[in-house]
Regions:
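Accessory interaction regions appended to the cores of large information-processing enzymes
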Residues: 1-110
Length: 110
């Protein structure tokens, strides 16, 4: 996995053989009721494999789990993903955990 901090958007890309996934997260100091979800379409011809609602569900579950384990709230403000990336959506639970764990241990050196 490769991690990036792009002006406060914490990003991870994962490529494993033919499978590929991208996730970008923006965090908030306070809980956010209406999380902004951006489904990026890289190619107009590429089918949308991922559903925004399901990706958001997995991201929020991953953030809740990590917040509980790390005893610190991680509130999601914005989610970015590529709509044509690989299934299953459950990978976004794990990608969220990976971003939060790295942010928790590396801080500004993310």
């Amino acid at each position: 996995m490769k991690f990036f901090n792009d002006n406060g958007i914490y990003k991870v890309s994962r490529i494993s053989g033919p499978l590929h996934n991208y996730l970008g997260l923006v965090f908030s100091d306070v809980p956010v009721a209406d999380v902004d979800v951006v489904a990026i379409k890289l190619d107009a011809k590429e089918p949308e494999r991922l559903r925004s609602k399901e990706v958001l569900k997995q991201v929020l579950a991953g953030a809740e789990h990590s917040s509980r384990v790390l005893s610190r709230p991680y509130n999601i403000k914005k989610v970015e993903f590529v709509s044509g990336d690989s299934l299953p959506e459950e990978i976004y639970f794990h990608l969220t955990q990976a971003i939060i764990e790295r942010l928790h241990t590396e801080g500004e050196n993310f």
